[in-house]
Amino acid sequence: MSRVAKKPISIPKGVEVSVQSDMLTVKGVKGVLTFPKSDNVNVVMDGDILTLSANDHSHVSLAGTVRAILSNMIKGVSIGFERKLELVGVGYRASMQGKDLNLSLGFSHPLLFVPPEGINLLTPSQTEVVVQGIDKQRVGEVAAKIRNFRPPEPYKGKGLKYATEAIMRKEAKKA
């Protein structure tokens, strides 16, 4: 069996997991997440511990994937996820207009980004954007969409980058 799927998931206090025949539901302080359950993966709840196993050898990797997704769902409804973006460049600014994000990224017009349902955007400063939510995949997708408005370029490093991202710099052309 998969090493990932072998590891049991402990459910923290304040989180409720329900396993139906076709759906997994996780309820917590921050919200509710659901995931369609495959017939090829067995999910057994024993008190506050979840264990997963594959029905046959060909679905071992699926059991590992479902275990990782379930673990992220439990973490999301209890703690939440966030991605931080930094704006690097002269005149690059971010501000909030209600729930929408207004970006000035050197274009002739400002960009207005409307976040999807379940995603919160914050701007602690004019050069920082924080994407928060309970669904890890959606938080990453929204952060990637915002970053793609002006990805960092390798010569000066200008653009929108993740806070943990290191930009590989190139040397300018020599005359």
Curated annotation (Swiss-Prot):
Entry similarity comment: Belongs to the universal ribosomal protein uL6 family.
Keywords tagged on the record: Ribonucleoprotein, Ribosomal protein, RNA-binding, rRNA-binding
InterPro entries found in the cross-reference section: Ribosomal_uL6-like, Ribosomal_uL6-like_a/b-dom_sf, Ribosomal_uL6_a/b-dom, Ribosomal_uL6_bac-type, Ribosomal_uL6_CS
Listed Gene3D superfamilies: Ribosomal protein L6, alpha-beta domain (3.90.930.12)
The organism of origin for this protein: Xylella fastidiosa (strain Temecula1 / ATCC 700964)
GO biological process: cytoplasmic translation
Name assigned to this protein: Large ribosomal subunit protein uL6
One Pfam family recorded for the sequence: Ribosomal_L6
GO cellular component, one term: cytosolic large ribosomal subunit
Upper lineage: Bacteria, Pseudomonadati, Pseudomonadota, Gammaproteobacteria, Lysobacterales
Self-association state and partner proteins as the record states: Part of the 50S ribosomal subunit.
Gene: rplF
Entry superkingdom: Bacteria
SUPFAM superfamilies: Ribosomal protein L6
Function: This protein binds to the 23S rRNA, and is important in its secondary structure. It is located near the subunit interface in the base of the L7/L12 stalk, and near the tRNA binding site of the peptidyltransferase center.
Keyword hit for Cell inner membrane: no
GO molecular function: rRNA binding; structural constituent of ribosome
S-S bonds: none
